[in-house]
A protein has these predicted regions:
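Short beta-edge/loop segments at beta->alpha junctions of small alpha/beta modules
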Residues: 2-94, 205-207, 211-225
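Glycine- and acidic-residue-rich phosphate-binding/metal-coordinating active-site segment common to enzymes
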Residues: 127-128, 133-168
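Hydrophobic alpha-helical interaction segments
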Residues: 152-254
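Short helix-loop-helix/strand-helix junction enriched in hydrophobic and basic residues
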Residues: 41-44, 49, 57-58, 88-127
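Short glycine- and basic-residue-enriched patches
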Residues: 27, 34-37, 94-97, 113-117, ...
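Hydrophobic/aromatic-lined pockets within catalytic cores
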Residues: 29, 48, 108, 181-185
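Cationic, amphipathic, low-complexity alpha-helical segments enriched
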Residues: 81, 92-99, 109, 157, ...
Length: 254
């Protein structure tokens, strides 16, 4: 058998797996000929050209076959949540979770894959590619001494299972505050309606103590003010409770 045929034989035993470059090299290293071959990247390149590896992003591949003609929507539907879980574990182990709009959508049984997802972690700010053209907006919270607050925020989460993978999901109150802080102009109307829907449905369980805790940290005062204004349109009693918390622990913006 040729070198390429030997590597294809190895891959065919791992169809459907997602491998990063190191894992792929390690897998191919089980072939004696590859242990002596220094330029492994060349065989990876040829395997990609022949349809045995589908690139999800730089140095991350789906093991597939030339007969399988994937569309990007199919790939996303089957593998997005697996790739997201793998990315989070590789970067931050278990100190991260889903926040903002997607966290609230998931609570309303909406698992559609958005162009971007917000992830709170203890280290990074910025943007990370998840796969294909889908990105993660990264956010970290620090105190005045620049110390990470991730351990404090990780007290307020729920565990959910999506696509066979477990994720930590921000409490709805935290998700709402981040939505009000970070919502784009294009999504504002949609986000506001989603917040109203959640709060009307779960009025009795709304956690005012969690809002108080956030204000005491010196975080999200503007979001709590926006929430008060939004709630005022459908529930004045709840709005007054929020107003009292703002005046007690921070300040009104008007």
């Amino acid at each position: 058998m040729s070198k390429l045929e030997l590597s294809i034989d190895v891959l065919e035993k791992n169809l459907g797996k997602i491998l990063n470059q190191d894992q792929l090299y390690s897998l191919l290293d089980h072939s004696d000929w590859l242990k002596k071959w220094e330029k492994k990247y060349k065989i990876v390149y040829y395997l990609r050209l022949r349809g045995y590896l589908f690139p999800l992003k730089r140095n991350l591949f789906l093991v597939t076959s030339p007969e399988k003609k994937w569309t990007e929507d199919q790939i996303l539907s089957l593998y997005y949540w697996e790739v997201l879980a793998k990315m989070g574990k590789d970067l931050w182990w278990n100190k991260w979770y889903i926040w903002g709009l997607k966290a609230l959508e998931i609570r309303l049984w909406d698992y559609d894959i958005r162009d971007e997802i917000l992830l709170v972690n203890g280290e990074a700010q910025g943007v990370e590619l998840v796969m294909l053209d889908k990105i993660a907006q990264l956010k970290s919270y620090n105190n005045k001494k620049k110390k990470s607050l991730i351990s404090d925020f990780l007290k307020y989460w729920d565990r959910v299972e999506i696509g066979g993978k477990k994720f930590l999901l921000a409490k709805p109150e935290l998700a709402i505050l981040e939505m009000l802080y970070n919502s784009s102009a294009l999504l504002k109307s949609y986000s506001d309606e989603l917040i109203k829907k959640r709060m009307k449905k779960n009025k009795k369980n709304f956690d005012f103590e969690l809002i108080e805790w956030v204000l005491k940290l010196g975080k999200h005062n503007s979001s709590v003010n926006k929430l008060m204004d939004l709630v005022m349109t459908f529930d004045q009693e709840m709005a007054e409770k929020l107003k009292t918390l703002i005046k007690r622990f921070w300040y009104l913006l008007y």
